Every structure is written in C-alpha cells, then in structure tokens.
Amino acid sequence: MSKDDVIEVEGTVVENLPNAMFRVELPNGHRVLAHVSGKIRMHFIRILPGDRVTVELSPYDLTRGRIVYRYK
C-alpha cells in the first residue's frame, strides 16, 4: 500500500489501552483503534486522553489506524 492510499482524519483520544493502543473518536462519531507511529514513539511524545491527533486510516480496514501527529 502506497502513501497515497491512506485516509488522514483528525480525532480526539478517548481512552488509553494496553500496548500503546488508543481509542480515538472521529468528528463523525466513529471510534477507531489506533496505535502510535514509530516517530512519535522514538521521540517519547506522550499521548493522553483528550489530546487532538491526526490518524491515518487504511481504506481496507476503517476500524484501525495509526496516530501520526499530536496537536499542541
């Protein structure tokens, strides 16, 4: 899957789950399961409930995603 195929959406972190997974609520009301991207993990960026984040979704599975950016 190339970089062009991903869907980027903004959302709000609702809860922390084990193994660096998060439940993220999208503006349309859907909730997705998201994990942290490698760059965020590498730079020790903390993600807490209530944070606004950008999530990349695959067009093949819209229930899972990757957190690629945390807004300040």
Curated annotation (Swiss-Prot):
Residues 1-72 form the S1-like domain. It is found in: Cytoplasm. Its main location: cytoplasm. SMART domains: S1. It holds the Pfam family eIF-1a. One of its GO terms (molecular function) is ribosome binding. Keywords: Cytoplasm, Initiation factor, Protein biosynthesis, RNA-binding, rRNA-binding. GO terms for cellular component: cytosol. InterPro entries: NA-bd_OB-fold, RNA-binding_domain_S1_IF1, S1_domain, TIF_IF1. The keyword Mitochondrion does not apply. PROSITE patterns: S1_IF1_TYPE. NCBIfam families: infA (TIGR00008). Component of the 30S ribosomal translation pre-initiation complex which assembles on the 30S ribosome in the order IF-2 and IF-3, IF-1 and N-formylmethionyl-tRNA(fMet); mRNA recruitment can occur at any time during PIC assembly. Belongs to the IF-1 family. This is Translation initiation factor IF-1 2. It comes from Symbiobacterium thermophilum (strain DSM 24528 / JCM 14929 / IAM 14863 / T). The lineage of its organism: Bacteria, Bacillati, Bacillota, Clostridia, Eubacteriales.
